[in-house]
Amino acid sequence: MDPERKRIEEDLRGVVAGDVLCDDVGRSLYATDGSLFEAWPLAVVRPRSSEDVAATVRWAAERGVAVHVRGAGTSLCGGSLGGGVVIDCGRFMRRIIHTGADSVRVQPGVVAARLEDHLGRMQRTLGVDPANAMATTVGGMIGRDTSGSRFLRHGAVRGRIAAVEVVLADGSIVELAPAAAALAGEAATADRPARLAAGVAAVLEASRDVIRTFQPPTRPTHGGYRMHDLEREGLVDLPRLLCGAEGTLGIVTAATLRTVPADGASAVALLLFDSLDVAAETAVRLLPLGPSACDLFDRRHLALARGTKPAFELLIPPVAEAGLLVEFTSPEPAECNARLDGAIASAQQARRGCIDTRRAEDSFDAAFFWELSRNVVSTLHGVRAAMRPVPFIEDIVVPPAALPDFLRRLQEVLKRRQETAMVFGHAGHGQVHVRPHADPREPAERGRLESLAEEVYAQAAAIGGTIGGEQGLGLSRTPFFTRLFPELAATCAEVKKLFDPAGILNPGRVTPAAAVQTVVAFRRPLPAAEAATDGERAAAPQLLPLLTWDRARLAAEVDACNGCGSCRSQATGSRMCPRYREEPCEEASPRAKADVMAALLSGELDPRTSAADAVRAVADTCFNCHQC
């Protein structure tokens, strides 16, 4: 460790009770997430309390250093990467503080699946159901304003949030709830929430036309700061503003969330079509019937599912070009079954109709069907090919009625550019993920992906759509957001100045980085022996001489992990790393081993450290049980 980082480590250890990591191996674990990006932090702090978070932010603010808050590190858009101090709330701040009759108070590191298990014992639920609920944290869900397949029934996190404890950019700790704005002339004596509410109210008033134009009520979710519904009953809902803010306005250290009665009976079916267009048109026609979920899959998604399990091969005919997973929920089984009957009948009346229908006969069938939405996508990350579907053009939201039009436009762009992509999403609220095939470690691919994204996002904007509606803008979408919606981006920048005038909180997300620059690149390529020239082989560091793998196989195994975080699963019904469940720290996750080996192979870590105690400590958390 160089003297400068040693000094930083000593400084931070002097003000926080939690862990501080400044060594190269520790930093390598936080240089990537579920996205294509790589950015090595200056330091990592794993706080034990709100006071630790506040002390870290104060230290950073005094020195003009950026702060990036992190939950599970599952972001697909580089949500928590950067060259400043990463604050990992998932290690220690994972306590359910209080459970009431209709609310729950939690720390930001609580895993969504664990929270649902806890609430389920009282027949309550948060309702919001991201596909990666087994790993993602409440703090991350707030930062992204997460929704999920059941948005039609339960909405997004912003609809559940009641109050938050937050650390602001100056290191102060405040409790935020819907607040009355401080009146003119009272700012000097008003408390901090009232002053912030007054500032936000002024921005909303000045930008009312912009917000109405670019965050219309006809679109279920919105990119950037969600400002369309912050004023209610004379109050400014500051907790709602933090939902989707991606840690750029403050760092949530506790949250009070409203809960609702757990869903009763449900009825689920998979409708299969010979055309993606017809599937999308059918989804629009089913919306008046009131489904709780309506997810869309293209033929590549279905083909991938067929390859993962023999049961999917039996369930899905190879001729299927698209599918809709439809769910109805009701207190009474007879009612939701009748509504599903109506949906199936409506689908079969479509132009050319659906070619097949698969109905879940019981809860086990339903859980299996739901794997199409929740588990199949994670297998993309292990595709053993250089060109694979990658998470770069994600999270497009269009008005649901415009979904068929957008998909036609998308197919035209892909065909003209001779691109291949996988398409899936939540058709019920117009949310689409596009995964173009690319080699994520090939430096030249970034330009091609950005050019494709520019075209696809422009098509969405042309029909009243936006980007970043469910997973945030992150590093990958913020530049496109500012170019596509400059007036709305300028309004977001005004809000950012109110909370973080120096721009130290997660710069480069939602608004462009200003005072603090965030330099981020795609992940470094891993040299493979069979592709290297003789000169490159001679220059390459000879790693792990006792390992029986050759370099090419080692690189392929490491590259099979993209950092999605599924190996951090805390879901009680799934099989995953028991060591991580016992000690949920990043170095205990299976992902950590791939991160360290990737850093060694790419040259970011000195190969001489391969035998160091820090590397050995990461390796020793694995006892080869193969549950990952």
Model-derived segments and spans:
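A glycine-rich phosphate-binding loop feature that marks nucleotide/adenosyl-phosphate handling sites
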Residues: 26-29, 75-77, 132-139, 223-226, ...
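Polar, glycine-rich mid-to-C-terminal structural blocks
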Residues: 163-164, 172, 185-205, 209, ...
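N-terminal glycine-rich flavin-associated loop
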Residues: 12, 35-67, 89-132, 142, ...
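Terminal amphipathic helices with adjacent charged low-complexity linkers/tails
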Residues: 255, 288-387, 419, 425, ...
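Ferredoxin-type iron-sulfur electron-transfer modules in oxidoreductases and energy-metabolism complexes
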Residues: 523-628
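N-terminal flexible segment immediately upstream of the FAD-binding catalytic core
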Residues: 1-58, 62, 72-102, 131, ...
